[in-house]
């Protein structure tokens, strides 16, 4: 597996988004099977595993801890995220983003992972107005060896600049795909200027760009795609030209639509690392194999130019996701 740099953190070119093993995508695989899938990804060269304390309220971290227990810790990169407000069961009168609150979150996560440090610790869904204070706390945790690096999730340019001036940021994590490109305008270029990596979640638009989902497909009641408007049957039909474009390039490159969508994300900038979810052995092989699919400069320009002419119908919005009832009320992105 090829590797990429998130600032000084070297990770596999494609990581594994672990959320779906316990959260947001309907019935999860049995724990034993899920652990086997994580091990399969690791054996194929994936060393970057992303989770968060908010996913299933700590259960996803517990799963990742069990999955990496028998893997060599020095070859595993744990990417974890802490929520900016107290989650159920947390008593934090001093505030979640105080130093005491962040330390309490971190200590809980370390215990669930069964480790004494986290490689990349990210503020999940950025709160407003406290960037410099959080950055200062992150700097202390790095010096103490509790975390190796820190990041922000879905921040503004101003939030990045303020925090980065206090403690250098290693990575920004935000949604990025052929169907969600708003970060191209300012955040991704800024990352390049400041030597900050960019971790792209939902790089295949929650599976739409895989070409394996039909407009008539139904989902379990706890599946996030029930509330993501791009999966509305009318929007799926309206977005068919995007999928046809991706399939055209997949045919030319002798690969799958999902691999083309990941290859496009990778080509956008050398410091972008996509973290698709993958809960089947064949998806792991397919998605990780996308690291070997290379678009030439001309192919990338042509594909991007064609995408620019197509309208995207529907999106993934925090206000819609709250309707699912599986995330805290303060989700706004």
Where are each of the predicted segments found?
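Short, well-ordered coil/turn segments that N-cap beta-strands
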Residues: 9-14, 45-48, 72-76, 114-119, ...
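Glycine/proline-rich, positively charged
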Residues: 89-182, 186, 197
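Active-site beta-loop-alpha junctions enriched in small/polar residues
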Residues: 19-21, 54, 81-85, 123-126, ...
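Terminal-tail/helix-coil boundary detector
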Residues: 1, 193, 221-248, 252, ...
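N-terminal binding-site loop/beta-alpha segment at the start of enzyme catalytic domains
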Residues: 1-76, 330-333
């Amino acid at each position: 597996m090829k590797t990429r740099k998130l600032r000084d953190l070297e990770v596999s070119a494609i990581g594994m988004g672990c959320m779906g093993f316990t959260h947001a995508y309907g019935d999860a695989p049995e724990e034993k099977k899920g652990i086997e899938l994580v091990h399969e990804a690791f054996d194929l060269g994936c060393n970057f595993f992303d989770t968060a304390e908010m996913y299933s309220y700590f259960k996803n971290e517990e799963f990742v801890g069990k999955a990496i227990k028998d893997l060599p810790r020095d070859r595993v990169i744990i990417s974890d995220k802490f929520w900016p407000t107290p989650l159920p069961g947390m008593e934090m009168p001093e505030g979640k983003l105080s130093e005491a609150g962040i330390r309490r979150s971190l200590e809980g996560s370390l215990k669930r992972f069964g480790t004494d440090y986290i490689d990349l610790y990210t503020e999940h869904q950025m709160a407003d107005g406290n960037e410099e204070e959080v950055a200062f706390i992150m700097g202390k945790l790095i010096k103490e060896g509790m975390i190796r690096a820190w990041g922000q999730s879905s921040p503004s340019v101003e939030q990045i600049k303020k925090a980065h001036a206090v403690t250098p940021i290693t990575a920004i994590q935000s949604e990025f795909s052929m169907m969600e490109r708003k970060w191209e305008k300012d955040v991704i270029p800024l990352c390049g200027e400041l030597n900050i990596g960019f971790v792209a979640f939902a790089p295949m638009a929650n599976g739409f760009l895989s070409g394996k989902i039909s407009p008539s497909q139904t989902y379990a009641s706890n599946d996030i795609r029930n509330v993501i408007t791009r999966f509305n049957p009318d929007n799926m039909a309206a977005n068919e030209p995007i999928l046809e474009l991706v399939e055209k390039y997949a045919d030319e490159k002798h690969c799958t639509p999902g691999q083309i969508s990941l290859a496009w994300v990778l080509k956008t900038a050398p410091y972008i690392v996509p973290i698709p979810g993958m809960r089947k052995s064949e998806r792991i092989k397919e998605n990780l194999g996308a690291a070997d699919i290379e678009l030439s400069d001309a192919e990338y320009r042509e594909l991007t130019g064609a995408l620019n002419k197509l309208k995207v119908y529907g999106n993934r919005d925090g206000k819609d996701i709250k309707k699912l009832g599986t995330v805290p009320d303060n989700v706004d992105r």
